[in-house]
Regions:
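Noncatalytic regulatory segments and standalone regulatory/sensor domains
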Residues: 134-246
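Charged, long alpha-helical assembly modules
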Residues: 241-300
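Residues that form generic nucleotide/phosphate-binding pockets
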Residues: 23, 72, 95, 158, ...
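Short helix-capping/linker segments at secondary-structure and domain boundaries
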Residues: 22-31, 261-268
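Short, charged/polar micro-motifs that form catalytic or ligand-binding hotspots
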Residues: 6-7, 119, 240-247
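Conserved active-site-adjacent core of cysteine acyl-enzyme catalytic domains
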Residues: 1-28, 38-179
């Protein structure tokens, strides 16, 4: 078994990468992992439906943090997927027998340590496996305060669940890690990449244009008496559910990015980044206030 130290975090993928890199000798906070990967985003995707309503996302797609950190830090990650579930579990066992710590992409629905009310069919939940005892795998799930255990059958189901974003048993781990990071170079580059994502995306439902588009839709629904009574509460409830219940949410990701800007302001001695961190925190506050007021409207 490795000497891995569990860390709770705000979001699964950024938390996993923070823990993996720190464990392998490159200390990195979760906000820094999130910020360097340029993962902040917004998307209102009309052609992907959940219960007849458009998919809303507040960050870049799954695996974007893992891949983004490779670009920003020089870390080389090894990725493995499997057609056969048994072979995928055997490969995991072989890594653990070598004392390796690995990240997995899983389905929340099949993880038995999740309370029943928190389980849903979401196939992009990231966690770390750092050992095993008998039939149990020792899990560092970033969203939990303490390490967890998961039996082999359940973990196999979680890794090989079918459907959207199916992981196909995805297992990943660092192969090459630099001794340090040139923050003065990579922080500004990552911020510029994120600005481009939010302000210059070619599609009208991505970034700031996507946020405005959603706002315009809400105003249009509010002006239509029939839609205001029936569809608007459903849409508001959907937005809040996507924002606050599924994953870290709109406000949560803004708070993480604000923490990245604050940490960066200290590393680079930048008053502008400190000011930007305050503005981003305020943006998160507004998203949370919106969710609160929308919830009250849904309840009447």
């Amino acid at each position: 078994m490795s000497n891995f130290i569990h860390q709770q975090s705000a979001h699964c993928e950024s938390g996993v990468m923070s823990s993996l890199l720190t464990h392998h000798g490159l200390p990195m906070s979760e906000p820094m992992a999130f910020g360097l990967s340029a993962a902040l985003s917004f998307a209102l995707i009309p052609f992907v439906k959940l219960s007849g309503l458009p998919l809303i996302a507040y960050r870049m797609p799954p695996r974007a943090i893992v891949k983004g950190l490779q670009k920003s830090t020089g870390v080389t990650m090894q990725f493995q997927t499997f057609r056969d579930a048994s072979r995928g579990m055997d490969a995991l066992d072989a890594m653990l027998d070598q004392g390796r710590v690995v990240g997995l992409q899983t389905s929340v629905f099949w993880l038995p340590y999740f309370p029943e009310g928190m389980r849903f069919h979401f196939n992009a939940h990231n966690l770390i496996v750092y050992g095993r005892e008998g039939d149990d795998y020792l899990i560092s799930d970033p969203v939990f305060e303490t390490p967890m255990r998961c039996d082999r059958a359940s973990l196999m189901k979680a890794r090989f669940a079918k459907g959207a974003l199916a992981a196909k048993g995805l297992m990943y781990f660092p192969e090459k890690i630099p001794s340090d990071i040139d923050y003065a170079k990579h922080i500004p580059l990552a911020i510029r990449r994120n600005i481009k994502i939010m302000t210059k995306a070619p599609l009208p439902f991505i970034g700031i244009r996507g946020i405005r588009r959603m706002g315009q839709q809400l105003l249009k629904l509010e002006r239509d008496a029939a839609q205001r009574e029936h569809y608007l509460p459903l849409y508001l409830g959907h937005i809040v559910r996507m924002q606050e219940e599924i994953g870290t949410g709109g406000a949560g990701f803004r708070f993480i990015y604000a923490a990245f800007l604050r940490e960066s302001s200290k590393l680079l001695d930048s008053a502008k980044l400190k000011e930007a961190a305050t503005a981003m925190t305020e943006a998160g506050d507004h998203w949370r206030l919106f969710a609160l007021r929308a919830s009250k409207m849904c309840k009447g």
